[in-house]
Amino acid sequence: MPPSIETYKQAFAATWRDDTPVDQVRFVVLDSETTGFSPVLDRILTIGAVAVVDGEIRLDDSFDELLKVTGDVGPVDVHGVTPDRSDRGYEEGEAVERFLAYLRDGVIVGHHIGHDVSMLDAALERMGTDVRLRNRTLDTADLTWHLAQDGAFAGVKLPHHLTLDTLADLFGVIPHDRHTASGDAFITALVFLRLLKLAARHNRTTLGVICQEFVIP
């Protein structure tokens, strides 16, 4: 097993407890651009992430890597990664190892984060390791719906399908570098900070409470 993956496993000797105050948690806001939506058939093109700690975005604690993809890179007009550019990226296994070394036991935050996690897990499987992402996850869409139930968005009718653009517009976040992994991670981090402030007003101040999944009735 690569040393970086063994180090990643050891990071979970003590995991974040449900009663951990939110301001004590290292959140890692993650986004990836991919060739498509199938973890089996498609591949990760770029991984972008930035940490949020104690209500602040830590630009000095960030990650941005390009991956080499053999074959079809998918919709270039969406993600902007051309085959020539992808050829200059890291091999998948090396990029994932580097990301795990950065991630450690951080709580993963993302918008519809299940896609990114499943793509990374598929990459780990192709590496021949039995390790999968062990980190707690927080989906900004789920947190938004919980806060809506709390009455945080009184007078605002939220669409059934919450996009990142919807939340950015709701909170007045200007979406720079949209559809790049690092750009979308930063936009999501800004949205997440707004959500954390609303959560605090509604007594959602511990990790277990804000990480709850939401099932739309």
Q: At which residue positions do the language-model features occur?
A:
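Acidic, divalent-metal-coordinating active-site segment for phosphoryl/phosphodiester hydrolysis
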Residues: 180-191
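Generic recognition of well-ordered alpha-helical segments
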Residues: 143-146, 167, 191
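Short alpha-helix plus adjacent loop in nuclease-associated cores
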Residues: 137-157
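Acidic two-metal-ion nuclease catalytic site recognized across multiple nuclease folds
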Residues: 1-18, 170, 189-217
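Beta-strand segments within the central parallel beta-sheet cores of soluble alpha/beta enzyme folds
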Residues: 64, 136-139, 206-208
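Conserved non-catalytic scaffold segment of RNase H-like nuclease domains
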Residues: 3-127, 131-134, 149, 161-175, ...
